[in-house]
Amino acid sequence: MKPLLLVLALCGAQVHAHSVGLRPDYNDYSDEDTRRDWLPEPLKPVPWQSETRYAQPQEAVVQAPEVGQILGISGHKTIANRPVNAFLGIRYGTVGGGLARFQAAQPIGYQGRVNATVQSPNCAQFPELDRLRLSESRGENVDDCLTLDIYAPEGANQLPVLVFVHGEMLFDGGSEEAQPDYVLEKDVLLVSINYRLAPFGFLSALTDELPGNVALSDLQLALEWLQRNVVHFGGNAGQVTLVGQAGGATLAHALSLSGRAGNLFQQLILQSGTALNPYLIDNQPLDTLSTFARLARCPPPSINPSAQGLKPLYDCLARLPTSQLVAAFEQLLLQNEHLGLTQLGGFKLVVGDPLGFLPSHPASLATNSSLALPMIIGATKDASAFIVSRIYDQLARLQSRNVSDYIDVVLRHTAPPSEHRLWKQWALREIFTPIQEQTASLQTVAPGLLELSNYILYRAPVINSISQSYRSVPAYLYTFDYRGEHHRFGHLSNPLPFGVDASLSDDSVYLFPYPPEASRLNPLDRSLSRALVTMWVNFATTGVPNPSSGVWPQATSEYGPFLRFTNNQQSPLELDPHFGEGIYLPNYRVIYKPTTNFSPPITTTTTTTTTTTTTSRPYAYNPYANWQNRPSQQHPNWHPADPEYVRAQEARQQEFIREREQRRREQQLRDQQRYPQQEPREQQDERIRQQREQEERLRQQREQEERLRQQRELEERIRQQQEREQYEREQQEREQREREELERQQREREQQQPEQQPEYNPEPVNPWGYPVQEPQPDDNPEDGRLPYPSYEQYGPEGNENLPETDANRNFSEEDREQQQQEQLRREQQEQQEREYQLQLEREQQEREQQERGQQEPGPEEYPSYEEYSRALQEKNAERDRIYAEEQERERQQQETLLQENQQHPEQSLPEEQPTHPNYEAYDGDRSYAEEQEREQQRRDQVEQEREEQPDEDQGEEYERSPDEEEAAEQDVLKVEDFPSYEAYLEAATKLREEQEEQEKLEEERYRAQQEEEDRIQAERERNSRN
């Protein structure tokens, strides 16, 4: 009984298995009529019917004889109900230190036990500069970064291998960008590679020490490692497809053209990038090296570098830490960013590298059909939106009505200078209308500028890459126009005045769930992702994206047909024969001759295709107008089994080929007719360019001479100022010594005069020579007050030797001459101070003008240097004239003072602030008669006032205390006590203000005292009346 039940169970299992079929990949639709014809193959159950489940980390062990025991993560993710193992951070090469960081890596040997459960850090890049510095401070090796990640389904066996090369701009990114969530729904292995970036992968001196193109050697080393070991992970080494994104596509294509890849990979998928991209080829690697060395503070290479001449640079680069070299590269990008993509360096491929990867230009290698591989190649619709958005501000500042001005800005940032004229002619012929050439505005020409940059950077390189290879190997063209919910970068958030559909790397969002915020797709995006993944995996498996239908035929020319991914829900996949018709410039087939003969075109079986009809100028006007209302591109009566439709399609294709050839011949004929007229114009343009260059060199030379002259003038002014200050210090010292000598001589004469002069006044006299008088009757002995201050209050306390206190002394002629000389010296000093003050004022005005930004116009503001020199001479002559007039006025003023001093010598005496009254100012002959008479009149007036007020109290006589006398002496300021005359004036002004304030306070006190006395007097009068 038990054997019978076992047999029945086995039979039932077979029947169930037969009814269910193989493992479901997509949903099946039972209704064949409702199945959409654009689908690449019949739909099966939805792979994303449930969210990805993360299992607990367990070890997945792989034994690789050349490597050792590799421990990965078993069940890293569960995708489509199937566990996926992950092997992360497996080293495939080793990088040395010092200068070896810029050279080819060495294969890694047997490692024993390898821990492949942790994601390895990315190679050195400036977005992770802080991490590099922290790792270096810990003593970690940040240069040994050559690792790869492998994702394999559980139980994989001889599956095709997809090797992803991350890219964009070749100076950032890492292997973590390739996640298995979408791709591993299919039976395929996914590998992602880390390689050296920026200067460590591309800096070149075209020598063995700095070869360049080291990133290509890293990729080759990783692919060699996979050829030996991928079989142990369940992969097929004979079915390796290299998938590159942007810059990664450039590396993948360049490696295939190098001829050194051999059988390391068999097919290519190039997304928005080829080896012919103009902005990823460095045509001047030595200039880039020189600029980088300067920013890294290393000795730059000489003009004709040699091995011995480059040794100091090598030693410096080997000595610097990795983080400092990365920081120097970041400065290189920021410094040259305004020059455009074609002028940036340090992250680009070089031609003629010693490693032999690019012995000649990639365009020349692309003409060799023996190096061609089957490929899927294309680009996103608006891949160059990122560059147009970055230069949009420059375009907005033009405000021009001529479209040529806008084209020049775009070409400066996107195309090599040698191709500017060719691309400009093509743009005016194929993109812009004649009306826009004279009535342009940024809003109207911006879509055309975006289309022009797309052709230069992406579509033209695609067309030129397959212009010869499509004859010998299959090539499938595509353009990704689909605009979904998520985008790879923020290029769509730009100031462009129109919508952008798909920008750079947006197609990768539907191939890998990266970045993490783009990992959750809506139903429409998931449908597009399923179609894209299926085609990519089908190509990796069979070499044909759609083996079961004719939706995507291979290219029959460099222009198509091509497949377009769109937002049209009725037909998301559209076929169009015009990928880039009309792009004949630049013609690389003429610039780079083919290296081998081409094989005849291969014969393919006729397939049913769906085409769209476009004009010969598909983007002549606004290509984005009414795109949502575009009619369906599919024939209403189309059916793959309709032979009439097939014949009609073939006839249309033949007609299209004939029309294209006719237009090409007509264009060549027009070019030949214009050639005789263009040649003189080109010669004239070249002559004008040479003249402008000569004028520019002369202008720069004159500017250099002018800067040197200004520098010399500045040094001369500084020297003169220093000499003037030194002279002033010496002059002050001499004046100080002369004053001291005069004072000493004066004291000696004063000591000698009392001995020589006879006494002529027998009467007793006071110290001032006045006769001693009897007390006047108006003195009040009771209160001691006098109606006016007595002469005794101004007595010379401790100053008997001063000239003004000596009553018997008259000024002699010798003293007067000395004082006149002193006056002349003071006037000379004041003259010098006024000149110095004028000079300071002029310098202050110049500084204020510079601070306000009112600088004098430079040579560039004048039509020619002669007019600038003439204007500069006029300004200098005007300044000299003003200065001469100032000098002349000062001289006339000085002569006037001298004449007055000669006519009135007694008025030229210096005015000094006396400590005591100087009566010579009132009476020069010392008779004192008038003074005595005035004193008697004052006494009589005071006596009369006292008689009128007999009872008024008399206040005490005010006498100065010794402290007040000392303070009065200290209040006298002398010029020699101050470092400059300005300081003396400031101190004198301050002292005068203090004295005035003190006088006001004394006056208020006196007024208050008078009021108090009046009040007391009034009180006495009232008492007396009572």
Curated annotation (Swiss-Prot):
<feature type="region of interest" description="Disordered">
    <location>
        <begin position="659"/>
        <end position="695"/>
    </location>
</feature>
<feature type="modified residue" description="Sulfotyrosine">
    <location>
        <position position="836"/>
    </location>
</feature>
<feature type="modified residue" description="Sulfotyrosine">
    <location>
        <position position="928"/>
    </location>
</feature>
<comment type="similarity">
    <text>In the N-terminal section; belongs to the type-B carboxylesterase/lipase family.</text>
</comment>
<feature type="disulfide bond">
    <location>
        <begin position="298"/>
        <end position="316"/>
    </location>
</feature>
<keyword id="KW-1015">Disulfide bond</keyword>
<keyword id="KW-0765">Sulfation</keyword>
<keyword id="KW-0106">Calcium</keyword>
<dbReference type="Pfam" id="PF00135">
    <property type="entry name" value="COesterase"/>
</dbReference>
<feature type="modified residue" description="Sulfotyrosine">
    <location>
        <position position="868"/>
    </location>
</feature>
<keyword id="KW-0272">Extracellular matrix</keyword>
<feature type="glycosylation site" description="N-linked (GlcNAc...) asparagine">
    <location>
        <position position="402"/>
    </location>
</feature>
<feature type="modified residue" description="Sulfotyrosine">
    <location>
        <position position="865"/>
    </location>
</feature>
<feature type="modified residue" description="Sulfotyrosine">
    <location>
        <position position="559"/>
    </location>
</feature>
<feature type="signal peptide">
    <location>
        <begin position="1"/>
        <end position="17"/>
    </location>
</feature>
<feature type="compositionally biased region" description="Acidic residues">
    <location>
        <begin position="945"/>
        <end position="969"/>
    </location>
</feature>
<feature type="compositionally biased region" description="Basic and acidic residues">
    <location>
        <begin position="811"/>
        <end position="854"/>
    </location>
</feature>
<feature type="glycosylation site" description="N-linked (GlcNAc...) asparagine">
    <location>
        <position position="115"/>
    </location>
</feature>
<dbReference type="GO" id="GO:0042381">
    <property type="term" value="P:hemolymph coagulation"/>
</dbReference>
<feature type="modified residue" description="Sulfotyrosine">
    <location>
        <position position="645"/>
    </location>
</feature>
<feature type="modified residue" description="Sulfotyrosine">
    <location>
        <position position="922"/>
    </location>
</feature>
<feature type="compositionally biased region" description="Polar residues">
    <location>
        <begin position="625"/>
        <end position="636"/>
    </location>
</feature>
<dbReference type="GO" id="GO:0005604">
    <property type="term" value="C:basement membrane"/>
</dbReference>
<feature type="glycosylation site" description="N-linked (GlcNAc...) asparagine">
    <location>
        <position position="810"/>
    </location>
</feature>
<feature type="compositionally biased region" description="Basic and acidic residues">
    <location>
        <begin position="867"/>
        <end position="893"/>
    </location>
</feature>
<feature type="compositionally biased region" description="Basic and acidic residues">
    <location>
        <begin position="723"/>
        <end position="752"/>
    </location>
</feature>
<feature type="modified residue" description="Sulfotyrosine">
    <location>
        <position position="29"/>
    </location>
</feature>
<feature type="compositionally biased region" description="Low complexity">
    <location>
        <begin position="603"/>
        <end position="615"/>
    </location>
</feature>
<feature type="modified residue" description="Sulfotyrosine">
    <location>
        <position position="182"/>
    </location>
</feature>
<dbReference type="GO" id="GO:0005615">
    <property type="term" value="C:extracellular space"/>
</dbReference>
<feature type="modified residue" description="Sulfotyrosine">
    <location>
        <position position="727"/>
    </location>
</feature>
<feature type="disulfide bond">
    <location>
        <begin position="123"/>
        <end position="145"/>
    </location>
</feature>
<dbReference type="GO" id="GO:0016201">
    <property type="term" value="P:synaptic target inhibition"/>
</dbReference>
<feature type="modified residue" description="Sulfotyrosine">
    <location>
        <position position="862"/>
    </location>
</feature>
<dbReference type="GO" id="GO:0008045">
    <property type="term" value="P:motor neuron axon guidance"/>
</dbReference>
<dbReference type="InterPro" id="IPR002018">
    <property type="entry name" value="CarbesteraseB"/>
</dbReference>
<keyword id="KW-0732">Signal</keyword>
<dbReference type="GO" id="GO:0098542">
    <property type="term" value="P:defense response to other organism"/>
</dbReference>
<feature type="region of interest" description="Disordered">
    <location>
        <begin position="723"/>
        <end position="1026"/>
    </location>
</feature>
<feature type="compositionally biased region" description="Basic and acidic residues">
    <location>
        <begin position="923"/>
        <end position="944"/>
    </location>
</feature>
<feature type="glycosylation site" description="N-linked (GlcNAc...) asparagine">
    <location>
        <position position="368"/>
    </location>
</feature>
<keyword id="KW-0964">Secreted</keyword>
